[in-house]
Amino acid sequence: EFVKYLDRSKTAVMPDPIYMVGEVRGIGVEVAMWWNDSYHETVLPFTNNIPQRDGGTHLAGFRGALTRTITKYAQDSGIAKREKIDFTGDDAREGLTCVLSVKVPDPKFSSQTKDKLVSSEVRPAVENLVNEKL
């Protein structure tokens, strides 16, 4: 519901958000996302309910997994070859609104303000969950 609220003034391009939740090696991962008709990407990353305005390893893992999954689908389905296009991460995230939340037992941040998550074990946890669920 939060992603719908964030996009209340935009036109959605899908009926319902995609929701993924799971735990990978003791790290809880929750993702809610959908696309709208804008060109702007909005991703709100959280660690243990604390927002990270500068992202971090959880955001890097999400972006990497999303790009790989969409690119693989485009190649496997023949869309990329038929339309003669190469997808990039920017293409995959255009119009995306996402709330990404991780629960980490002992998170590491780049500073005391907790603006950026730097715990290296979080990236593969997020990548694995997003790859599996998408």
Curated annotation (Swiss-Prot):
GO terms for biological process: DNA topological change. Keywords: ATP-binding, Cytoplasm, DNA-binding, Isomerase, Nucleotide-binding, Topoisomerase. InterPro entries: Ribosomal_Su5_D2-typ_SF, Ribsml_uS5_D2-typ_fold_subgr, Topo_IIA_B, Topo_IIA_bsu_dom2. It catalyses: ATP-dependent breakage, passage and rejoining of double-stranded DNA. It is found in: Cytoplasm. GO terms for molecular function: ATP binding; DNA binding; DNA topoisomerase type II (double strand cut, ATP-hydrolyzing) activity. One of its GO terms (cellular component) is cytoplasm. Its EC number is 5.6.2.2. Its main location: cytoplasm. It is an enzyme of class 5 (isomerase). It comes from the Bacteria. Pfam families: DNA_gyraseB. Belongs to the type II topoisomerase GyrB family. A type II topoisomerase that negatively supercoils closed circular double-stranded (ds) DNA in an ATP-dependent manner to modulate DNA topology and maintain chromosomes in an underwound state. Negative supercoiling favors strand separation, and DNA replication, transcription, recombination and repair, all of which involve strand separation. Also able to catalyze the interconversion of other topological isomers of dsDNA rings, including catenanes and knotted rings. Type II topoisomerases break and join 2 DNA strands simultaneously in an ATP-dependent manner. Heterotetramer, composed of two GyrA and two GyrB chains. In the heterotetramer, GyrA contains the active site tyrosine that forms a transient covalent intermediate with DNA, while GyrB binds cofactors and catalyzes ATP hydrolysis. Few gyrases are as efficient as E.coli at forming negative supercoils. Not all organisms have 2 type II topoisomerases; in organisms with a single type II topoisomerase this enzyme also has to decatenate newly replicated chromosomes. This is DNA gyrase subunit B. The lineage of its organism: Bacteria, Pseudomonadati, Pseudomonadota, Alphaproteobacteria, Rhodobacterales. The gene is gyrB.
